[in-house]
Amino acid sequence: MPILRAAIMMDQTPNPGPENKISLMIIGAQKAGTTSMKNYLGQHPSLQVHPHKELSYFFDPLEYEKGFDTALRKYYDHPSASTQLIAKNAGLYVSESGIIRLKEHNPGCKLVIILRNPVERTYSSYLMEKNYGAINGTFESIEPVLRKGDTSDWRYEFFIGMSLYQTHLAMIYKHFPKEQLRIIRYEDFKARSAELCTELFEWLNVDASFKTDTATKYNVTHINRSPSYGRLVVQLLRNQNPVKKLVRKLMPGKMDYKVGEMLRNINKTNKLYGEIPESMSKLLREYYAPHNEKLSELTGIDFSDWNKPLTK
C-alpha cells in the first residue's frame, strides 16, 4: 500500500475548518507541477479552485491586510457550503510569515507539497526567469552565485534556496503537525497523477470514485519569442503597477487575470529548451547531496536517487 494512501486511511476525519476557509493548500514547490495538481483537483464537483495560477493572499502582506472576504471575491466564483476550497501558491513553502497567516486562517488546513529533484528544479526555475527577462546569462553563469552562497542575492534564493527543501519543511513543521502535510515526489506525480488525486480526494472526504483527467500538462516552460516583450509583460502584471490597477478597475471579475495570461501566451513558441548542461548537473548534484540526505532523515522518504546523474 503506498505511503500516502496508508496515511490517509488512518486519518479520515473531516476537515475542521469553518465554511469558506481553505481546506487544502498546495504550498510548493515552485516548478514542480503544482499548477497541474491544482487544476486536476479542481475537476472534482465537490472542490473549487481559483483560475489564477497562484493565490497570493497569504504570501502578499498588502493583500492579506484587505481580509479574506476580499480575497474570496477575487479568486473564487460563488463559493458555497457544499464545496471545499482548494488553493495553490507554489512559493508559500519558503515564506514563514505566509505559513503563519495560513494557520491563523485555518489551523486544520491540509497541506500538499510536491518535491522535485533540486537539480531539475533549479534549471527549470532559471528557464522561467530567463523567459521573464530577469536573467540574460547562460545557466553556467549561476555557478559563481552557487559558490558564493550569498542569500541576499535573489538568484541564489530563487535558483538554490528554493531547492533546499529540508530547511523549509523544518520551518513548516513548527506551525503545522506532520499529519497535515502530504509530501509527494515529483517523479510519482508524473507517473501516477490520477491515483494521487484519488488519494487526496479520500483525504478530503469527498467522492474518491471520481475519475480525474490528467492528460493536460500545465505551465510547461517554452522558449519565448522576445525577451524584451517578456520583461514588459512582467512589469505590467506587477500588483503595484498603475496600469494593472487601472485594468482591474475597468474589467469585471477575473478578466484582468485572463488578459495577463493572454499577454504571456502571445510570446510563447512551441519550442522547448534543451537539457541541462552536464557540467552544471554534476556541480549541482554534488552541492545538493548532503541536503538531500538531511531531507531523507527529516521526512523518512528516500531521496538518494536524486544524487545520481539525470536520465534523459
Where are these predicted regions, by residue range?
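Generic structural signal for small/hydrophobic residues in well-ordered secondary structure
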Residues: 33-34, 86, 102, 111, ...
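A short acidic, amphipathic alpha-helical/loop segment
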Residues: 97-101
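The conserved 3'-phosphoadenosine-5'-phosphosulfate
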Residues: 171-282, 286, 300-301, 306-312
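PAPS-dependent sulfotransferase catalytic core
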Residues: 1-93, 104-105, 109, 118-151, ...
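A structural signal for short, well-ordered beta-strand segments and their strand-loop junctions
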Residues: 49, 85, 110-114, 180-185, ...
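Surface-exposed cleft-lining segments at the edges of enzyme active sites
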Residues: 89-90, 148-160, 275-280
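Short catalytic/ligand-binding loop motif for oxyanion handling, primarily in non-cytosolic enzymes
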Residues: 35, 93-96, 119-124, 190-195, ...
